């Protein structure tokens, strides 16, 4: 007989669930289960990842949540009366139910959080449409009433749930674990359910995938509670049976109530939610009367072109480039996007807030004419297709840097302009890396800090190239020796290996902000401020991380606070006060010989991207003569291209011959002495030599960048 697990926790039930989503889905596939649910505690962090993994495996994904019910109202916060909350299982039957889950998990975080993200009965009743509800686990209201001998209260609650959900959407949940009181509880639930002709459903409250994972989930709980594994009073599960049991196991356990098994299939068949996101959710930028977003963008570009180029604005190259970009932008539906970013930059400029942009947006003449970017893409041979590829529609991505002491003003402006309910910061998830896993596990195993530090320091810490514990064991002889010689260290390392990659905490992206055309909870759930975001004027955080938001078509803008811009702005203020000269990012001289002399002497302290020891050494060897030399050095100073730095410097000083493999490559690579430094050079070469279109050249660039 087949069976579907409808009560399942993943690693996104933070420090409680030990089920990696991909491994969980893989195991369900091995067990030939037709469907599987995700029901994490109080959040929907993992639902999109789960949905995609399940669909890819050919398993039907069921979206749900195990929410927390407040003892009284979700706004009540009395330490004696409201500290304890109850669990409740909710599954989305359709799109309406999914949207109600978004609102339930959002309200629980934003309005009901008190020890746990809670909702109350009134809120649940208002958002019950499209949801299937069960009586829950042993920590739910009805089971708890029965365990604590309050049968009248259990009946009252049953009546309430039947009134709200009806007999077709409310199920009495039964579980079988090696726990003494659960036998008596199940008897009472069956007796109570019989009075209502209730539908029963079997679940297993899955918290880990395999039986042997119980020990690792126990370690996770100890990490969560900050307790030693040896502490007899710490929170722990009373049974090691909360794994993804097979259909055969579940059939044996519920042989006396077969309908509880078949109902899992019936519920799975009824639950149909499509998370195949379509389109983009960009706010419609408000334009003056008589304009559309398309015509207003064109109008602003013409004004900007006059300021940037003066009489040259009608140069055929400039005119053709502008018209091409505007056509591509409009065909992709991104007119409002550019107006939104323009407006942010306009506000910053008018408010005296220094800003700059980074990334491929510098290849856009539209962005340059709007004073979003400060670099002339035509003069510097920057390609628009590197930014927006006409052959592949994808959301533009312009990262904005603001002076860090005034970044919050920009966030306030965005929230006021588009609405607090349409703006949110972006969540991040911290996972246990090798060293962190060792230290977390050592703490609960009561291994002294000096001992674990010795072991942790044996794991190589290479920026950009994290090494797993398994790799370190294979590659670091001293670590392998400690592992082989000391049983305690062996146990520590083996346990930590299983902990690696487990989600440990939620944080906030340093710069990312979502700006939506509708209240964000129409599309995704939101979260209260996480660690690192408490001081932000934007008090909501998405429950979905960056990559998920991109796949949903949400507008994301990076508001990065940069101390370098603050220092520069203050320096220019001092110059104005002392010398009466006004400088900003548009008119600071880029060819000052004294500046390059200072850099050549290694005086790089405090200079963004140049002040590191290795970089400074190369700058001294290079003795830069112009800004192009500096730009090339910054581009080369990363793993891989760094190998070309000595040749670049020698060729620059005439100490090594410059060679081109084809005469047509000379104009492309002349400025970098025959060395490929920039991705745009590869794109131009593929067009000139390979006959690629510019769109195809960007596809080539992407393919190369993945190698």
Language-model features: locations:
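Alpha-helical scaffold/interaction cores of sigma-54-like transcription cofactors
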Residues: 1-707
